[in-house]
């Protein structure tokens, strides 16, 4: 998100089943967008870091959607966090959200069976853990430095 040539880079590692990540997307990300991305000071990169099997499946669904639907899917899943993560059958709830976004049941089922995507996601998580010491979500890295996930810490690092 933002100008690829922006002078600063904010990287977010997140899990779709992380309540703190949902709060970050609701409260902090809009401030980052308004004050840092829209002003050209920074670009924002989201990286999947699913913390459990349900999160892996949810992240897989966002990746199976057309690229232009990725951010809307993530936003929808976070906005409806409690309604799908706490269901007795969260996969059915996830399938319903995917359907609303235009993903049919066949594509949804095929997506969840995609072993290559699943293994690729696990591999990336391992890389992020080794390279950036990511071990929880949300993890925020600004210009290569891990910072707290509040807006003031992020802005302070950008303005350094």
Question: Can you say where each PLM-predicted feature lies in the sequence?
Answer:
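Extracytoplasmic thiol/disulfide redox context detector
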Residues: 1-52, 122-131, 160
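Stable alpha-helical elements in mature extracytoplasmic
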Residues: 6, 17, 25-28, 57, ...
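Residue-identity detector for threonine
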Residues: 9, 17, 39, 62, ...
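C-terminal cap of thioredoxin/glutaredoxin-like
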Residues: 15, 96-160
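A short, structure-level motif marking secondary-structure boundaries and short turns
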Residues: 16-19, 78-81, 109-110
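Structural alpha/beta surface segment adjacent to cysteine/selenocysteine redox centers
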Residues: 22-99
